[in-house]
Amino acid sequence: MKRWAALCSFCVLVFLVFLRVIWSAETELKPAPATYVGNEVCKACHAPAFEKFSQTMMGKIFLYNPRNETEKRACENCHGPGSNHVAAGGGKGVGGLITFRKDSGESAETQNNACLTCHQRGIQTYWEAGPHASRGLTCVTCHQLMEKTTDKNQLVKAGEKTPFFYKRAETEVCGQCHVQRKAQLYRSSHMPLREGKLTCTDCHNPHGTPNPSQLKQASVNENCYTCHTERRGPFLWEHPPAFENCSTCHEPHGTINDRLLKVSDPRLCTSCHNATRHPVTPRPPTSVFFFNRSCTNCHSQIHGSNHPSGQFFQR
């Protein structure tokens, strides 16, 4: 019995020694938690970058007019506490700092989380549920943090104004990826983005929304009614395609047809109204010139009518 007790005691002692060795090894391998060192320490090595940052909108807030303790950290507010970086003598990727270069190796989630520390409300509320986040885009894909820019959103593209067009910075940034939509803006009938009267963000929120196509409003029609209030109604006589979805007939970014129509009139109308003849004609049309006329010559109130005799949208 004594031998069994001694054996058990020995096994317990060996196990405790083993745990002690493992715990000591983990303690030695795990670096000490990093602490904040302050802006002046960063400036001592990164003077050119610090000078650039001080000229940006965000730099002016963090360095000269911080609103809370978090903003007072400035550099370390985005890159993280720098004590381990300083202790290791600096260098790219040393000390656990978050970096935002394209070749940094940081994941999109890590970079974006640094921004979302402050920018997680308002228009950024739905960022994590949006298509840009799910496709691995980072905030610095569109925004530049270390360069002075006249654009209030610190976008990576600058605007350009000439006598013939006005390239807004927002439109140029979106056009980097959405090349098909950018090309549509140069068609004969187009939204006035290339003239600078609208931007992509007048209709879309690139940071994400609970709505389709990242629309700012709950539906396509509600988005259109923001400007085209005369089309909202309510109407006594409703035209179902117009009531259900404006994009049934219109291509909002640009087309080769008048009034942003997807297909020229009357072919657009006959895609639904495909009877072999018009109700007021005794037989099918025999002249090609019939098809060169517009249905809206007679049915002018095609979006809807409140006239007592407006069943056919003629007035």
Task: Spell out what each predicted region is.
Residues 1-12:
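Bacterial N-terminal signal peptides that target proteins for export
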Residues 4, 16-315:
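Short sequence/structural segments immediately N-terminal
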